[in-house]
Structure formats: C-alpha cells, structure tokens
Regions:
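ABC transporter nucleotide-binding domains
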Residues: 1-168
Length: 169
C-alpha cells in the first residue's frame, strides 16, 4: 500500500524476477527467483500493472498461448481459459480481439493469464484499477476463493479501503 510513486510496482517486479535488483534476492516458497527462475515462474502468477498483452489475439487464444508457455497441454489450456473467462464474465467477449477490449476487460484477461497455470502465489499490481464495481466484487470473490484453497495473493494498491477489505496481513 502506498501513494503513486512509492515503489510498489518496483518492489513487485523485483520480487517476481521481472526486474533485476542491484543486490539481494527474493524467495518464493523457498525458491530463489534468480537462481531457479523456471521453478519460480511455475509457482508464480504475475499481473504487472500496464502490461501489454498480445492484443491481436482473442482472449481465449491469448490464454491458451500463456497456458502453453507455462507447460499446459493445449486442451487443458483451452479448458482453463474457458473456465476463467466464464468466471470473469468475459465468455461473450471471446471472439473479439483484445485490442477491442475496454481497459477493465483487458485487466480481467491479464488476471486470467496469471491464474491459467494454477500458481501457488499470485502477484497482482493494481488489480482493481479500471475495473467496474461489479467486476471488482467478482474479482474479490475469486481471490478469496483462491486463498481458501491454499493460494497466496500479494497485491498492490493505492486505495487503503480495498486493502483493508481484502487482505488478512
């Protein structure tokens, strides 16, 4: 939590291995994100703020692509993509290119991409920014269910009320 410019995004990108720190390291479930990058990436689902997606693909095609990059079989990735798009109320948008999505829809597809491979830890940078109130409630429920099943969510926000409502520590 912190105001814009406080270093939330920088901290998260270093902790997930997307940005190299000057010194030190980060561990995810005992795995050094710099020494064992592939193992760490399998444990992490990351949604960086402002990440450009492959917007010339449809949502389902993008999610299948991401799932396969994480080692999922194409049929498993398709099934997971279908489930995630339905859970995020994006099933109807499946035939549209991501470039035609609203900012909120794009944010939800990015969340689905972070979840596609069933990671143990989700790292979400400003996950509620540009998302409508109904979708924000839905996302909160998805994240709550995820943590109840044993997952860990690390998120950044500059909205203290969101953090207080969602976070346990």
């Amino acid at each position: 939590v912190g105001p814009n410019g406080a270093g939330k995004t920088t901290t998260l990108t270093m902790a997930t291995g997307l940005l190299t720190p000057d010194r030190g390291t980060a561990y995810v479930h005992g795995v050094d994100v710099w020494a064992r990058t592939q193992e760490a990436r399998a444990l992490l689902g990351v949604m960086p703020d402002g990440m450009r997606l492959l917007d010339r693909l449809s949502g389902p095609d993008f999610l299948v692509h991401v799932g396969m990059l994480h080692g999922l079989d194409a049929s498993v990735a398709r099934e997971r993509a279908h489930e995630l798009l339905a859970a995020l109320d994006l099933a109807e948008a499946g035939k549209k290119l991501i470039s035609d999505y609203s900012a909120g829809m794009t944010k939800k597809v990015a969340l689905a991409a972070a979840l596609i491979h069933s990671p143990r830890v989700l790292v979400l940078d400003e996950p509620f920014e540009a998302v409508d109130p109904v979708s924000a409630t839905n996302i909160r429920q998805i994240l709550t269910d995820y943590t109840r099943r044993g997952g860990t969510v690390i998120l950044s926000s500059h909205v203290m009320a969101t953090v207080q409502q969602l976070c346990t520590h």
